[in-house]
Amino acid sequence: LIQLLIAAAAAAGLTVAHSDPRCAENPMLMGGWNREQAVVFLCAASIRAQGMDQEEILRHELIHVIQDLHQGALLPEPLFTILARETIPSGEVMMVIASGDDANRELECRLLTRMLSTHVVAQWLTESAAKNRQGVVIPVALVPKNP
């Protein structure tokens, strides 16, 4: 199913790369999203070394793209807080908060990565990108139905 995500990324005007210079700089980095170059990258060696799943990492990074297309949170409060408490282990929450990044954005992405199938993320990305290209204002706090 990783090919479905790659195809959805291409339809959205993105390139998926299996490496990036940042991967060598940070062996714990699994992937990232470069807005300026419209590139989502996977750190394939790190993913293998950590025993992670490339499809899950790509799904996570594409949810970050969807967050950017929607220019805001995808889940409304208090739903986000309730789901995060029920789904994400407290140690992981503390690690994200300590990282100094936008904690709510990252936690929302981790939550949705766990909750949404590859098919849903692919559909959501292609629909969001198409609406964005048409200049349609995309409502936030809207999760598509699972096909």
Question: At which residue positions do the language-model features occur?
Answer:
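Active-site scaffold of zinc-dependent metalloenzymes
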Residues: 21-55, 68-69
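Catalytic Zn2+-binding segment of zinc metalloproteases
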Residues: 62-79
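Non-transmembrane alpha-helical segments in soluble domains
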Residues: 6, 55, 59, 63, ...
